[in-house]
């Protein structure tokens, strides 16, 4: 049965940021944790596969409003897939991450989308398809056009990135955050509660059509 995620939640106290939950989904070793660590700590290193789920929090300051982003990094191994579905609950956004050098991971991202579609009503969740590891372009198995066309066919946001080179990592999370705030509506200035504040004073990258149709 589909569950209602609703819009990002705003605190009842005046001036508090919206709170949104974002889940990272994808096969093992596609770079979900690397993307999260690069975004949160500007750090890149070889990491062990995630067991269960890792959790990060960051407050994004847009000047007139702010958003507290709760980032849930889920395990990609098949044996954890049923557990990962538990982390869908209450999600407002999802990154479907694949490795551009592994066609199978692209297909797996499509399966994760099917799982999301079973859990949520259309338009309830902001979804971005993310092709990681553009630094390994010579080993590419999934073309940019393939990713773009699939995203367009499903009304998803789409970007390619490299956690290793820090290419478009911030843009991915910031674009999703801006989409979440747009949906929630700008209700005036907000004050971050906790976490690291990051200014989003740049124009978002060109995006595909609205993800998970409105």
Curated annotation (Swiss-Prot):
Domain of life: Eukaryota
Name of the featured protein: Ras-related protein Rab-17
Amino-acid positions noted as binding Mg(2+) in the UniProt annotation, renumbered to this chain: 33, 50, 73
Spans annotated as Disordered: 183-204
Regulation: Regulated by guanine nucleotide exchange factors (GEFs) which promote the exchange of bound GDP for free GTP. Regulated by GTPase activating proteins (GAPs) which increase the GTP hydrolysis activity. Inhibited by GDP dissociation inhibitors (GDIs).
Positions of S-geranylgeranyl cysteine lipidation: 211-212
Gene: Rab17
NCBIfam families: small_GTP
Protein location: Recycling endosome membrane; Melanosome; Cell projection, Dendrite
GO molecular function annotation: GDP binding; GTP binding; GTPase activity
Record-listed E.C. numbers: 3.6.5.2
InterPro entries: P-loop_NTPase (IPR027417), Rab_GTPases_membrane_traffic (IPR050209), Small_GTP-bd (IPR005225), Small_GTPase (IPR001806)
Cofactors, names only: Mg(2+)
Species in which this protein is naturally found: Mus musculus (Mouse)
Family in the record: Belongs to the small GTPase superfamily. Rab family.
Predominant cellular place of this UniProt entry's protein: membrane
Keywords annotated in UniProt: Cell projection, Endosome, GTP-binding, Hydrolase, Lipoprotein, Magnesium, Membrane, Metal-binding, Nucleotide-binding, Phosphoprotein, Prenylation, Protein transport, Transport
Catalytic activity: GTP + H2O = GDP + phosphate + H(+)
Motif Switch 1 in this chain: 43-54
PANTHER family linked to this entry: DRAB11-RELATED
Record note on domains: Switch 1, switch 2 and the interswitch regions are characteristic of Rab GTPases and mediate the interactions with Rab downstream effectors. The switch regions undergo conformational changes upon nucleotide binding which drive interaction with specific sets of effector proteins, with most effectors only binding to GTP-bound Rab.
Gene Ontology biological process terms from the UniProt entry: anterograde dendritic transport; cilium assembly; endocytic recycling; establishment of melanosome localization; filopodium assembly; immunoglobulin transcytosis in epithelial cells mediated by polymeric immunoglobulin receptor; melanosome transport; protein transport
Binding site for GTP: 31-33, 50, 76, 132-133, 135, 163
Motif window: Switch 2: 75-91
Purpose: The small GTPases Rab are key regulators of intracellular membrane trafficking, from the formation of transport vesicles to their fusion with membranes. Rabs cycle between an inactive GDP-bound form and an active GTP-bound form that is able to recruit to membranes different set of downstream effectors directly responsible for vesicle formation, movement, tethering and fusion. RAB17 is involved in transcytosis, the directed movement of endocytosed material through the cell and its exocytosis from the plasma membrane at the opposite side.
């Amino acid at each position: 049965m589909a569950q209602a995620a609703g819009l990002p939640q705003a605190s009842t106290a005046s001036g508090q940021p919206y709170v949104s939950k974002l889940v990272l989904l994808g096969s093992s070793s596609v770079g979900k944790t690397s993307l999260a660590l690069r975004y949160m700590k500007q750090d890149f290193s070889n990491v062990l596969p995630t067991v269960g789920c890792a959790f990060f929090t960051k407050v994004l300051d847009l000047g007139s409003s702010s958003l507290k982003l709760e980032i849930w990094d889920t395990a990609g191994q098949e044996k954890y897939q049923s557990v990962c579905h538990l982390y869908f609950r209450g999600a407002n956004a999802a990154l479907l991450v694949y490795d551009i050098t592994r066609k199978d991971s692209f297909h797996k991202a499509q399966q994760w989308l099917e799982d999301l579609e079973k859990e949520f009503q259309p338009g309830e969740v902001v979804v971005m398809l993310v092709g990681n590891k553009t630094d390994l372009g010579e080993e590419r198995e999934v073309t940019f056009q393939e990713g773009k066309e699939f995203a367009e066919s499903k009304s998803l946001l789409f970007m390619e990135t490299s956690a290793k080179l820090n290419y478009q990592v911030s843009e991915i999370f910031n674009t999703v955050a801006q989409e979440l705030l747009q949906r929630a509506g700008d209700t005036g200035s907000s004050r971050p509660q906790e976490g690291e504040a990051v200014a989003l004073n740049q124009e978002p990258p060109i995006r595909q059509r609205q993800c998970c149709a409105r």
